[in-house]
A protein has these predicted regions:
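Collagen/collagen-like triple-helix sequence repeat recognition
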Residues: 1-62, 73
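Short, T/G/N/S-enriched strand-turn elements that build extracellular solenoid repeat scaffolds
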Residues: 82-88, 103-112, 132-136, 157-158, ...
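Right-handed parallel beta-helix/beta-solenoid
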Residues: 48-84, 101, 277, 285-290
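Parallel beta-helix/beta-solenoid
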Residues: 90, 112-113, 120, 137-139, ...
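Extracellular beta-strand/beta-solenoid scaffold signature
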Residues: 105, 127-135, 152-160, 180-195, ...
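Consensus "Asn ladder" position of solenoid repeat domains
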Residues: 146, 171, 205-206, 228, ...
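Glycine-rich repeat segments that build the extracellular carbohydrate-interaction surface of secreted
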Residues: 62-66, 84-103, 115-121
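Right-handed parallel beta-helix/beta-spiral solenoid domain characteristic of secreted/periplasmic
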Residues: 77-79, 114-161, 175-181, 186-188, ...
């Protein structure tokens, strides 16, 4: 038969218990894309100019000017004495001895390897006392472009040199005139090697004149003496040393002897044959005392 009519809705039941809490979602969303860079702001005002800087002295390039006071050895503010320059320079550096007259009354000692004493036009060292003005030891030192002389004849050498591989180049070394024959003169000399303590000395392009001897080469020293001019002296004296002489020449007044080979000096090269030694040195007058 037919379905009967729907009965009335029953009353609402009681509310059921609250269900469990669901998981917490992420607190921060994903970072969005970076926005476009904004326009550059205007340049700020220039700040005040700082104080002037200073140039520190360079211990490898030291400058000396005769009579300067209160210097620091820089080119702009040089020392006043060569002694200050030698004290300040570091090994392998150069002491620039600018033009001027430098009176010397006490010995200057240079023993810093590789240092150059560099003279300039008018750089004159004047010895004013009976002392050796310059003693060189060590290795690889150069004395270049200086003039050495004295106010009176003193019985000393201008340069005493010992060590290895030194150079005496482009200098003028002379004494004041002395009366009478040269064998009566005060024994002043251009340079002297330290006995047994000078190896491979180069002496080149110097002028030696108006003193007892251009040089005294002590025993057991070696080197080369090349292209020098010597006059008004008693020449180079070789005392049991071994030096090569080549290209040297002799001026006027003539030397009493150009090269003297003292007793005990070796025979054979580099001295023999004597005729070749003479020919290789502008027909040198040689006193062979061996």
């Amino acid at each position: 038969g037919p379905t009967g009519a729907t009965g009335p809705t029953g009353p609402t039941g009681a509310t059921g218990p609250t269900g469990p809490r669901g998981p917490t979602g992420p607190g921060v969303g994903a970072t969005g894309p970076t926005g476009a860079t904004g326009p550059t702001g205007p340049t700020g005002a220039t700040g005040p100019t700082g104080p002037p800087g200073t140039v520190e002295p360079n211990p490898f390039q030291v400058y000396v000017l005769a009579g300067a006071v209160g210097g620091d050895g820089s080119q702009a503010n040089p020392f006043g004495t060569i002694q200050e320059g030698i004290a300040a320079v570091l090994p392998t550096g150069t002491v620039h001895i600018l033009g001027g007259t430098y009176p010397i009354s006490s010995t200057m000692v240079l023993n810093k390897n590789g240092v150059t004493l560099q003279g300039y036009s008018g750089s004159i060292i004047v010895l004013t006392a009976p002392v050796i003005p310059l003693v060189v030891t060590g290795n690889g030192i150069t004395v270049d472009g200086l003039t050495f002389t004295s106010d009176n004849p003193y019985p000393v050498e201008f340069i005493q040199i010992g060590g290895t591989n030194h150079r005496i180049t482009n200098n003028i070394i002379f004494g004041p005139p002395q009366p009478g024959p040269s064998d009566t003169w005060v024994v002043n000399r251009g340079f002297v090697t330290q006995s047994g303590n000078m190896t491979n000395l180069l002496v080149r392009n110097n002028i030696f004149h108006t003193m007892r001897q251009a040089a005294y080469l002590n025993p057991n020293t070696t080197g080369n003496i090349i292209n020098n001019v010597v006059y008004n002296t008693r020449g180079f004296v070789n005392d049991e040393a071994i030096f090569v002489f080549s290209g040297n020449s002799w001026g006027i007044p003539e030397n009493a002897v150009d090269i003297a080979l003292l007793e005990g000096t070796i025979t054979g090269p580099p001295f023999d044959p004597i005729t070749e030694l003479s020919e290789n040195n502008s027909l040198a007058t040689i006193s062979d005392q061996r």
